Structures are given as structure tokens and as C-alpha cells.
Amino acid sequence: MYIIFTDLDNTLLDKEYSYREAKEVLRELKEVKIPIIFCSAKTRREQEKIREEMGIYHPFIVEDGSAIYIPRGYFKETKGQPINDYEVIILGTKLENIIKEIQNLQKKGYKIIGYQDMTPEEIAQVTGLSIHEAKLAKDREFSETIIEYDNRGLEKLKRKFNVEIGGRFIHVFGKGADKGKAIKILTRFYKEEHEKIKTIGLGDSYTDKPLLKAVDTPILVKGYNGKWAELDVKNLYHAKGAGPKGWAEAIKKFVLKGGIK
């Protein structure tokens, strides 16, 4: 049984947040009931919207490995916290802990401006998201996205939280948050209920390194600059295309055409 763990932005989604080039491959994966698990910096509400659009209803990993959301009854036992329709395993910290520290630093004169300091309209302007999508992006539970900062303030934040420099913005999340750890937890659950599990992981940047190192077959899609990110990951396959085009090409090679023995 294959399990696919995938990043979203610039991997399964293109620069315009579309998955059109992977649509047919997604349809084929759903037909053969292969789990597709999102593992992204995106929030629960953002991922729920994408899952609904794609018709994917498997577990998902939010906010850079801060938490795992598992639909209730999906596994026999998870020991997760029951929250609404999910069993939730929290690895990171609550947003309020991060915001409290950011506000303390702001009061001391450090420049740190994040999503919680901005309106959805302002977030939409700097990200290219729609107003509705910006509202979903702002509705964070375990992390904060920093738009503007000074280096001294960032160094202060690093003492208490993980600080990840992304392609455009800074992501701040709890010390326990870890994409790789989240993937290993979910893989263990699958192995308890299924035989011969093979894990596939797809990403596009160095922030996906923990994801790629936690799977049997790591796949790096090409960046939209025409280059691959430089990653030291064993047996890393470099997909020829960028974004969902590269995603679809790799899945055809390794999953739908039986490339993995």
C-alpha cells in the first residue's frame, strides 16, 4: 500500500494556487484508494478548503508539523485529542503563546509584524491570496507568519520557538513541531492496520527536508526558477517538471506505473 505525503505551495499547487496539471493523476490515485496526506505550512482551514475541492479526506499535517488532524474513526486508535470531527495530535505550541512573546518584543521596540497584526485585506495584498483565502491563512492555531522584522527581534524569537525562513516570509512555531515526526507518527498508524506500507514524499524546497527524509521515496519537484533546491537527502529523485506538473510526472513514474518494487 502506498501513502503519499505532499507539500502544497509550488508542489501540488502552482504559483496561482491551482492543481490543474495534477488533476488527472489525483483522480487515478483516488480510484485506487491511495491516501494523499497534505504536509504544509498552511492552516487547518486552508487545508480543509483544498481537501474539499480535491475530494480528499485523509489525515493532514498543518502549520509545519505543529499538529496532525485525523478524521474521527479513520484509525482504530490514535490517542489524539477529540476536537470537532477530528482526533488531533499536537506537536507544537498554541498560537497565543507565540503572540504573547511577539507582543512583548514589540513593546520593547523590536520590529516584528505578522499576520495577527494585519487585516485580511493587507495579507491578500502581500500574498496574492483572495480576501477569503487571506482570512483562512490568518486563522492560525499553532504558528505565526512574519512579514516584516529586524534581525535582533528574530534572534530573540529563536530562543523560545522554531523560526523557519521560507521563500517569502518567516514562519514561527513551537519547538516540538516537526514535519518528519508527524509523518512517522501517521506512518506508524498505517502500519498497525495495513501490510507492506510504502511512503512517498513530495516537496519543492529546503523547508521540506524533514518531510523528504521521513519517507521511503523522497521526490523533489523543480522550482519555478528552473532549478531544484539543493538538499542533502538520500536517494532523492528530481522530478523534471515544476509544481503540479512535476508532481504528476513523479507519481506516474513511482506509483501509477509501479516504479517502486
Where are these regions (language model features)?
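Short, structured coil segments at secondary-structure junctions
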Residues: 54-56, 63-64, 159, 214-216, ...
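Asp-based phosphoryl-transfer active-site loop
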Residues: 1-16, 183, 212
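Short hydrophobic/aromatic-enriched beta-strand-loop microsegments
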Residues: 57-63, 132-134, 218-223
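Conserved acidic, metal-coordinating active-site core of Asp-based
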Residues: 105-200, 206, 214
